[in-house]
Amino acid sequence: MESLFPNKGEIIRELLKDPLILKNDSKRSNGSELELDSSDLLQREAILANELNILDNLKTFLNLIKEVKTNLNILELENCYYSLQSLRKKMRNNAAYLKQSFNFQQSISTYVDTLHLELVSTLYKILTNGFWKITENSIQFTPTVEWGKDKVHIEYDTFMDFVAQQYFPKGSLDNQAWFILDMTSADSQEQVRAKLNTIMKEYMNLSRIVSMIKNSIFISGKEISYENEKNILVFSKSSSHGQHCVSTVLTSFEAVCDFMLDGLAFRDRKTLSYELGPLFNTEFTKFVKNNASIILESLDSPLKNLVSVINNKLTRLVAKSEVTNWTHSGKEIQDLLMNKQLYYNLLLDKVLESHISEIRSIFEDPKKSWQNLEVVELTTSNTNTMSEKIGKNDSDVQNEKELHNAVSKDDDWNWEVEDDDADAWGDEIDVNIDDEEEKTNQEKEKEPEEEENAWDEAWAIDENIDDASLENGKEHLKAHDVGSLDKDHIEVTQLPKLFLAISQNFKSSFADSHVDEQYFAYKYNLLQTSYMAMCTANFSHNWCQLYVDMRYLIERDEKLYRIKELTRNLLETKLNMKYRIVCQLIRHQLTEFRENERNPSWDATIEKLLPYILKEIVRPLQKIRGEEGSRYLLSFLNFLYNDCVTKEILKWQIISEVNSENLGELVSLLVNNTDIQLLAKEPSYKKMREKFATMGKFLPLHLKEIMEMFYNGDFYLFATDELIQWIELLFADTPLRRNAIDDIYEIRGTALDD
């Protein structure tokens, strides 16, 4: 200072003129000069210089704040960010600022916090109202915008590079970054964090766009269109159906592909491709395969060309996105489009669907015209053939079992019961006859009354069994009414004729086509299966009529192999369950004899078994008629007489005198109530009934009376061991029994020698 101003006196005089260094105004006003010490002035000068320096530092803060505001106003957003960063750095490190009062610092910091929020809000507004315009029904992207009152030109790529690098350098928001951590206002800090998270979620990860596209592609009732000039995707509802629906779905997906390929920046194309690509690949391939019959309706189908175009665009999308989490070569779709064999197979699928619909329409007829019965000729086999299958050799009783086994092997229906399977029915599940009857009644109650009456009238089946005849075991439930038709004719519904027409039409549609033979056979079997399933559902209580219809249908077309198999299974399943019920009822009755032999209840036989046999087995099989009806009736009688009764009784250890009468009465009831005139000419039927009736006759007799029957030749149908087994079961081991057995051996042995 002295070097600059050597004249100290002059300096002092000049300073005395400055009112700031006067001690008080009164002294000056009095005109008295203040004598100041030079050292005092220097001290004061130092203080003023320090204050000036502080003010100069604080002025720097003001300049930075103005710089931030200016950059923000002119949308120099990156410069604004760096200016704000410099301001925050000075606020952390500037000693002059840190020496200011807390209130001063708090005021400055709060104001700077608003600058943070203002900058982020500007970024958010430019994204939401500038580059992107996303509504519930549209997505529009603009790669370059003019923003603000000065129409500042902003490029999307540059803008997003800045946002990503400065705010999300690690791909996510860092809550420890200076931009958030340096803020002191919790409210402003939370607002900044929320807006940055929204920017990250919706404009970096494009989650909202991903969701909108994902929820609209490959979905019927949704449509997407792309307006190239405005670069906008428009989402709307669609009411198209069938082929138009497929076309709408495909064009919607093409619109999305075009938008991603031509309308987006690389960074966003890559993001959407990464998020949606695997879904695109899977759903597009799946959709094309599921709708191939529509897409490949003709060799030059426009949908086929559309799929090919989309397939190529999807391949381009993979390449232009440079993602690694999915691939799409397009080969699978292209091979599918070029596969003519597949085209013909899909055409077959379409024809099959239409024919199944035609079958369904038959049963949807409110008039039920398919139930109308017509009389057709019954195809019958030679009666001798039946006798050969089930008959027995009169001269050799022992050969009966061998012949029986041979019949079973030759019998395609496999209903004859072999000796090794005698206990098979005992191994079956327990069947509650009461539950079965209740279930049947409940099912019948569900049917319309008119339909039930119509079937009853058509079948002429008396549903009401005479109570008096059930109460009295002596009253016979005769089972020889086979209807009013002659033996060479039978009634069928309209179903066989209707299906024959459908079947013929189905086959003729591909008479000269290139459809794979195995595939055609598979679909033809599927047509038959569908027909049989619908028939079964509509014949739930008239299975015998269904069998008659199916048998007639098979006679008209022997190549209906699937229907033939299902028809056989139908009859076997129905009879199988009924056989089980009969077997259990017999066992109930035999158990009643053992437990209460002197006063047994006959309800199981009279109230349940006999009516059940007549109504559920004999009558339906009589209605079936033909070779099958006779064969199954014979099989049932063999099962009833031999397996259910004879073999079960022979398992007993001993038969008391009282139970011998009970058993004889049971056999008598069964014989009298299974007199079937349809089988009257069958030799095997006559022998079976005669042997069973003979058993019922000798059961209550004394040994002497039984031996008289033996001497008279009444046991010619019984093998020697079988007859002796009965005698040992009925009578105690006495000399009389031993003599009787010896006589049987002697006479039978002599007869064999002769």
From Swiss-Prot:
Assembly description: Component of a peripheral membrane protein complex consisting of DSL1, SEC39/DSL3 and TIP20. Bound to a SNARE complex consisting of UFE1, USE1, SEC20 and SEC22 or YKT6 through direct interaction of TIP20 with SEC20. Binds the coatomer complex through direct interaction with RET2/COPD and RET1/COPA. Binds TIP20 and SEC39/DSL3.
UniProt-listed InterPro entries: Dsl1_C, Dsl1_N_dom, Dsl1_N_sf, Zw10/DSL1_C_sf
Location of region: Interaction with RET2: 406-459
UniProt keywords, alphabetically: Endoplasmic reticulum, ER-Golgi transport, Membrane, Protein transport, Transport
GO terms under cellular component: cytosol; Dsl1/NZR complex; endoplasmic reticulum; endoplasmic reticulum membrane; nucleus; RZZ complex
Keyword Membrane among record annotations: yes
Residue segments, region Disordered: 425-454
Primary localization class, coarse: endoplasmic reticulum
Cited function: Required for protein transport between the Golgi and the endoplasmic reticulum. May tether coatomer-coated retrograde transport vesicles to the ER membrane through interaction with coatomer as well as the SNARE complex. May contribute to the stabilization of the SNARE complex.
Phylogenetic lineage: Eukaryota, Fungi, Dikarya, Ascomycota, Saccharomycotina
Designated name of the protein: Protein transport protein DSL1
Topology of this chain in the membrane: Peripheral membrane protein
Extent of Acidic residues compositional bias: 425-438
Stretch list, region Interaction with RET1: 406-440
Region annotation Interaction with TIP20: where it falls in the sequence: 1-200
GO biological processes: endoplasmic reticulum to Golgi vesicle-mediated transport; ER-dependent peroxisome organization; mitotic spindle assembly checkpoint signaling; protein transport; retrograde vesicle-mediated transport, Golgi to endoplasmic reticulum
Further details from the record: Present with 8970 molecules/cell in log phase SD medium.
Domain of life from the UniProt record: Eukaryota
Localization annotation: Endoplasmic reticulum membrane
